[in-house]
């Protein structure tokens, strides 16, 4: 049996849709259930940020996780495949009536992705104060907590609704298939078979 960690929300639905096409089974989680067993697969419903931990520690053989999470945490996993679902961007956001001021001695950036933010602004030789937040990040520049934010953006509508605009795009992100290193050795044939079946479906699901 292969255990697969999925992120809650749309990416999980899109991933299960791929499995339905491949195997012809329903692959539906019962209401509020966090585990789904179907055929040779056990799916776990997990917070996106926790998936690298589940896979790294061996609680899951395989996981589906955003590239932004991989770049933020750099987990020790095997990166198998870009699934081309869950597409989004990591962007710098600022108030509509402002511009990023690189002449400041220090920029205050509110984000839940401090490593991505730090690496990006380091390339611009800009001193940074990171303000780590876990939600409502758009609020930070509006109340003077930060000069700007670094956050995941899908359509940009949330920023617009809160009086912010995209100043710069740091990276493009989409969901990736990853594997535990030990599982990739012990269950290599099963994981590679799954990899090839999913890869065949990707052009049809974009």
Swiss-Prot record:
CDD domains on file: PBP2_HisGs (cd13595)
InterPro entries per record: ATP_PRibTrfase_cat, ATP_PRibTrfase_CS, ATP_PRibTrfase_HisG, ATP_PRibTrfase_HisG_short
Record Gene3D superfamilies: Periplasmic binding protein-like II (3.40.190.10)
Listed GO biological process terms: L-histidine biosynthetic process
Pathway info: Amino-acid biosynthesis; L-histidine biosynthesis; L-histidine from 5-phospho-alpha-D-ribose 1-diphosphate: step 1/9
TM stretches of this protein: none
A single GO cellular-component term on record: cytoplasm
Keywords, alphabetical: Amino-acid biosynthesis, ATP-binding, Cytoplasm, Glycosyltransferase, Histidine biosynthesis, Nucleotide-binding, Transferase
MF terms (GO), sorted A to Z: ATP binding; ATP phosphoribosyltransferase activity
Pfam families found in the cross-reference section: HisG
Record EC number: 2.4.2.17
Cellular localization per UniProt: Cytoplasm
Reaction catalyzed: 1-(5-phospho-beta-D-ribosyl)-ATP + diphosphate = 5-phospho-alpha-D-ribose 1-diphosphate + ATP
Subunit-level organization: Heteromultimer composed of HisG and HisZ subunits.
Protein task: Catalyzes the condensation of ATP and 5-phosphoribose 1-diphosphate to form N'-(5'-phosphoribosyl)-ATP (PR-ATP). Has a crucial role in the pathway because the rate of histidine biosynthesis seems to be controlled primarily by regulation of HisG enzymatic activity.
Notes concerning its domains: Lacks the C-terminal regulatory region which is replaced by HisZ.
NCBIfam families, A to Z: hisG (TIGR00070)
Family affiliation: Belongs to the ATP phosphoribosyltransferase family. Short subfamily.
This protein's name: ATP phosphoribosyltransferase
